[in-house]
Each structure stands twice: as C-alpha cells, then as structure tokens.
A protein has these predicted regions:
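Glycine- and aromatic-enriched membrane alpha-helices
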Residues: 1-454
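Positively charged, small/polar-rich N-terminal and surface patches that mediate targeting and assembly
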Residues: 403-407, 421-578
Length: 578
C-alpha cells in the first residue's frame, strides 16, 4: 500500500466513523422529543423517529441522491435513480451513506414540532417527500455544485442545508396542523404543557452534543492534506459555541423567569450546535463563542415569539433551535469568517472582508427558506385535504400510543416509585427526629380537623384517622418514626396533586405554568390507643423543613372499625391479637 492509498483509507475511515455518529443522532432526537412531550405519546414519537431513517434511507438512495448530486443544472441535479451515474462519477459509496444520515437528520427535526396530534400515516408521507425532493433540491444548490455553491455560499456542515430545512418544515407543519388541545386559552394566552421526562431530554441533548463532533468534524471528509488541522479546529469551535450558548440561556432564563429553566437551557445547547454548524471550519474560537452567545439569545426569544406571538405550538422548540439558529448561524459567517481550510482568508465583515460575502449568505438563507416554505405548504395541505393530517380530538386526548399503535403505554408497569432518603438509612434518620426541637405553631405543617356526629365507637373508645400528604422521599423515615410510637398499621398510596401556594409564578419554556400536579405520598392511619396529638407532633417533626411542599395533615373522627376476620369492632379491631 503506497502513501496515497493509505491516505485515502484514513479519509474514508474517518468519514464512515463520522457517518455512524451522525446516525446515532437519531437516538438523541428520539430522547429529546420523547422527554419534552407527554408519556401518552412516547411510543408514537419513537416510531416517527425510527421511520424517518428507515423510510428515508431507501427513498434517498432511489431518488434523492441523484437529485442532490447529479449535474443536470444549477437548480436540479437530475433523475439518476438508485444513485446510478452519480456514484462513481466524482462521488463514492462513502458519500452516499454520509449524505443519507444527514438527510435523515433534516427529516426527523419535524416530528418534535408536530408531536402529539399528527396522524402517523400522514407523517410517513411527509418523511418520504422531504427525503426524496425537498432536502435534495436545496442540498444540490449548496453542496451539489448548484447555483449557491457557484456564488460562494458557505455552509460547511448544514446549518441551512440540514437544520434550517428541517426547521422551516417544522414551522410550516406545526402552523398548518394547529396547536394541541388546551395549549392556548380563549384569549390566546399560551399555556405550558410540560414534558414528562427532562431526564430523557437531557440524555438526548448529551447524545446529540457527542454526535455533533461527527456531524461537523466528519464534514471535512478527510484527515489528509490538512484535513486533520481543520477537523481539530472544528471540534474546538463546535464545543465552544454549544457551551457558551448553554451558559447564555441559563443566565437569560434565570433573569427572566427567576429560575434557570432546565428545558430551555437544554435547547440552548442544541441552538449553539446548530448555529456553529455552518461556519465551524472558518471561524476562530472567539468567533464561535460570540456565535454561541447570539444563539442563546435567539433560542430563548425565538421560542417565546413562536409560542406566544405566532401562536404556533412547538412542543420541543424545534423552530427556535433549528430554523432560527440555522439561519442565524449561516448569516453570522459573513461577519466572523477568518479561515479558508488551513489558510487565513478573512472574508468576514469584522475582519475587513466587506459585505459581499455577507450578502451571499443572506441570499442563500432567504432562497432556501422560500423553497422549503412553499413546497412544504403545498405538501402539508395536500395531506390535510386527502388522508388528513391531524388525529381526532378523542385520540389526541387519549394519547397517540393507543389509537395509532395499539400500545397501552410505552412504559410497561409504569407507576411512581417511592424512594428512600438518599444516602441515609431510614432508622438512622428516624433516630435523629427524637432530638428535634418542637415545631413552632406558626411554622408547623398545616393540620385540618374534621369532626362528625357519633364518632365514638360502640365500646366508648375514640377512634381517629390521620391522613398525611407529603413528599415520596419522606416515606421510610415517616414509617420508622410512626412505628417508634406504636403505630404500625397504615395504608400508603402514590398520588399526584397540588396545593394553593402564594409566590412567584412558575415557567416552562417561557410559558407560565397554571397548575403543576406533583407526585406525592398519601399515608392513612387509624389510631385509638396512641393519642392523635402524639401522632401529629411526630409527623410534624419528620416533615418540617420550612419550605413549600412540606405537606399537610388531616385528622378525621371515625365512627367505627370492624376487623373482618374476627368480627372485632372499635378499639379491639385495632389491636394485634396474634
């Protein structure tokens, strides 16, 4: 093997590894979109992401690749079916698989913005159309030797070619589809509909961040001939923009919402990655940091604008992340471009390059927006007026997992878990309660006393039921504390609910949360021998922290208790007769 063959093998290997990383972005998108939507639609989201790639792969091979990389004209590549006449004529199989995973990325962006109310069949049709025609045509303009490429338009890894295409399609689709039931009040105020798992969303964000090194770094398609230097710079600028955008969004939401918003900050990471994708090879680390800051502002105010002003319901923020930041990142190259490969070529306005290059970038963005917006409007309206784009109201309320896929739940045997106190044995924590000072009356956990007529049992002993609502994490220590005063029988239920609290409003992705139902623990005990006052005092000591959410205690008079096995009633029914 000579040096040339070795270099070719290294370049191909590098590109194939990058293609595998880009493929794994599908898992990241699936996790982000699933986590940011409700559990009753989780299976449907997963299927849509799976079909984006599974339908897109053969469609892009049969039709899309020829349109994108054919040489028929500057506007349209040509109909080279099954990549025939394209692979082998300046392109190879490595390019085919690399562009296939890029095409799937553009397609999958739309599923999140149209989540929870789109027919699965309609979505499959959309996915095939964007993979066959929409993405390949604009891709030909940019990467296939088309008219934008001839003008000098620069989009290294796809801020416009991939992300903005998907983002514009997402905006058009969500607008035509309409908002989810309950998203907006009658006066048009946006309501927050929180996703069911920010943990899944965060996992997806980290997967995407990791895979983006292949998405951007692999776009060098070579390590030889200076490619290694460019790839190294791409890694640095990609990571820098994402990190700075994340911090920027955290700070903005901390100021605007009084707390750093988790879901919006996760979107901030993705926004930084999208924005830097076009110019990661030509900007300096300083330029990438500034782009990250711009992306942070754009995603927060962009998501709020789409949600609250345009009244377009985008459950995962795909429009703000991909459409707005795809366009922004592409245009900002005109300001910050400094390199051309391994050479310094300051084309950016801030480096004295003038406005010509900036104008080309703006022209390219506008042209692609127009192409995607017009064609996707036609596609979605055809689907809407033929097979239908949206599920029925009943199906939407039920959740799409059951009516679309026959899936009762994406989470088998799902139910809330009652955790123990982290890092502490229940007995140890209960022992500490004995040394706790009495709780001041004005700071105590609220106690409600409910009385009824004829509440004494037939034997004259007073019976009382104590109902405790508290955090699930308090279960073990509360159980141990009650056992310590002789209360061993109890009924425990996992519940969800909320209390009426005064204070600062809560926000989710910029929209105020009206009511948040939180997982709680409901513990019920009936006592007679143990004084109610003792039970209440112990419960107060266990639950009190001084913060909202400590819980509540309800005390009821009980008319009678009957033990079914023995027939014992009242006080005797509560005693251990073993």
């Amino acid at each position: 093997m000579d040096i040339l063959d070795l270099a070719t093998s290294v370049d191909v290997g590098w590109t194939l590894v990058a293609a595998a990383l880009v493929f794994f972005m599908q898992a990241g998108f699936a996790m982000v979109e699933t986590g940011f939507t409700r559990a009753k639609n989780a299976g449907n989201i997963i299927m849509k992401n799976l079909m984006d790639f599974s339908l897109g792969t053969p469609i892009f091979w049969i039709l899309g690749f020829g349109i994108m990389f054919g040489a028929a004209s500057p506007f349209f590549g040509g109909f080279d079916f099954f990549a025939d006449g394209v692979v082998g004529e300046g392109y190879d199989w490595t390019t085919l698989i690399f562009q296939t995973v890029f095409c799937a990325t553009a397609a999958t962006i739309v599923s999140g913005s149209m989540a929870e109310r789109t027919k699965f069949s309609a979505y499959c049709i959309y996915s095939m159309v964007i993979s066959a025609v929409i993405y390949p045509v604009s891709g030909h303009w940019i990467w296939g030797g088309g008219w934008l490429a001839e003008l000098g338009f620069h989009d290294f890894a796809g801020s416009t070619a991939v992300h903005m295409v998907g983002g514009v399609a997402a905006l058009v689709g969500a607008a035509i589809l309409g908002p989810r039931i309950g998203k907006y009040t009658k006066d048009g105020k946006a309501r927050a509909i929180p996703g069911h798992s920010l943990t899944l969303g965060a996992l997806g964000c980290f997967i995407l961040w990791f895979c983006w090194f292949g998405f951007n770094g692999g776009s060098t398609v070579a390590l030889s001939g200076g490619g290694a230097e460019v790839a190294s710079r791409v890694f640095v600028t990609t990571n820098m923009a994402a990190a700075v955008a994340t911090v920027t969004v955290m700070c903005i939401t901390w100021i605007r919402y009084k707390k750093p918003d988790v879901s919006m900050t996760l979107n901030g990471s993705l926004a930084g990655l999208v924005a830097i994708t076009a110019g990661c090879d030509v900007v300096t680390p300083v330029g990438s940091a500034i782009i990250g800051i711009c992306a942070g502002f754009a995603v927060v105010f962009g998501i709020e604008f789409v949600d609250q002003k345009l009244k377009v319901d985008d459950p995962v923020g795909a429009v703000g992340v991909h459409c707005i930041n795809g366009a922004l990142g592409t245009i900002l190259i005109g300001l910050f471009a400094y390199y051309n490969g391994t050479e310094v070529e300051p084309l950016g306005v801030f480096y004295g390059g003038g406005f010509h290059f900036l104008g080309i970038q703006i022209l390219g963005v506008v042209a692609v927006i127009a192409w995607v917006a017009i064609t996707m409007t036609i596609v979605f309206n055809i689907i809407k007026h033929t097979i239908g784009l949206r599920v029925s109201e009943a199906e939407e309320i039920m959740g799409l997992d059951k009516p679309e896929h026959g899936l009762s739940s994406a989470y088998a045997d799902f139910m809330p878990v009652v955790p123990t106190v982290l890092g502490t044995k229940a007995g140890e924590t209960a022992a500490k309660i004995k040394d706790t000072a009495p709780v001041a009356v004005e700071k105590a956990v609220p106690v409600t006393k409910v009385t009824t007529e004829g509440s004494a049992a037939a034997d004259g002993h007073k019976l009382s039921k104590v109902v405790i609502i508290t955090k699930q994490s308090k279960f073990e220590v509360l159980k141990e504390a009650l056992a310590g005063i002789g209360v061993s029988g109890m009924t425990v239920t996992n519940v969800i609910g909320c209390g009426v609290q005064k204070g600062a409003a809560e926000y989710y992705r910029g929209a105020e949360v009206d009511v948040t139902l939180l997982p709680k623990l409901k513990m019920e005990v009936v006592v007679s021998k143990v004084p109610v006052e003792t039970v209440v005092e112990v419960v107060k000591k266990v639950l009190y922290t001084g913060h909202i959410g400590d819980g509540k205690i309800f005390v009821y008079d009980v008319e009678n208790v009957i033990k079914v096995r023995t027939g014992a009633e009242g006080f005797d029914a509560l005693q251990d007769d073993e």
